[in-house]
Amino acid sequence: MSRFLRNAALAALTMAAAGAFASAASAQTYSRLVVFGDSLSDNGNLFAATGGASPTSPPYFQGRFSNGPAFTELLGFNAGRSAAGASVTGSINYAYGGARTDSSAFPPGMRNQLLAYTGAGGTFRSTDLVSILGGANNIFQGLPAAGASPNPTGAIAPVVSAAAADMNFLVNSIAAAGAGTILVGNIPSLGNAPQFRGTVAAPLAEFAGTSFNSALLAGLMTTAAARPGTNIILFDIYKVGAALTANPGAFGLTNVTDACFNGITVCATPNTYLFWDGVHPTAAGHQLIARLANDYLYYGDIGAQSTVQAETAFRQREDLLDLASEGMSGRADWQAGTHLTFGAIADSVETDARGS
């Protein structure tokens, strides 16, 4: 039966619930990782393609759009870059900084990333884990014109709709091709990113991001119902960011509003910042994102133990963030997820390519 897992910020996690569900967990296993996306997932593809020109490294870390590895490099696989002639039988990363969700030529849009993978002989298996994350660059590039129009929200709406449609096309195509598990990230709060925070563009950026997330979710629910052989996991990065911003100290952070790297100088304590630059997380931020992603990927079936109202199950438990030194005070912000099955239905104003 198809499973659609959606992170959700449910209130009041209790230790009793955590213990009850933790004992019922059964770990998931995957044979390899295939990645499609933009700078949040890029492990150095754009850097290699531009001859080391973008992003500037250092201060960026070895071609990543951060000061350390991207979260996709922390999911238990050593995925290779998508250079010409690269093997597509093992783990591989096709994400490019600056990529849109469409068929843009360069950086390769995500539709083109998928075409490049399948064109090289790449296939999808029931044991594969596929990560898909994108949409922000479409919005970044659409904001200037939309902001200058008489109806900014109306002008940005087609950009948002097209990006969400691209994402859902990718998910549906990959599921139809046989992928067992697809991790689909939505986009974080754009209005609260340093690039937009406090600017006149912030409200429109936030509107665009949240509208995209809503459209993405609606499409994924339809796709999950139509693709019973694939587990589709919506990784709610928006709510991850909200949890970190609401209680930064619980996660070892002291600054969740400013960029550590301002384009000239790097802050003294990058590991205490959430943002590396105007829109990208620090290595510490990527590590926190990866910890929660791993929790859902490897223990994502816990919700099945608690069915509530027809085909909906709610999961309340402690996420394994390995933050014991921080105590329990902030962990509830990470907790919970909503697990949906479909038996009842079916039986920021620049691209990240330049390093900001």
Model region roles, listed by residue range:
Residues M1-A27:
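Gram-negative bacterial Sec-dependent N-terminal signal peptides
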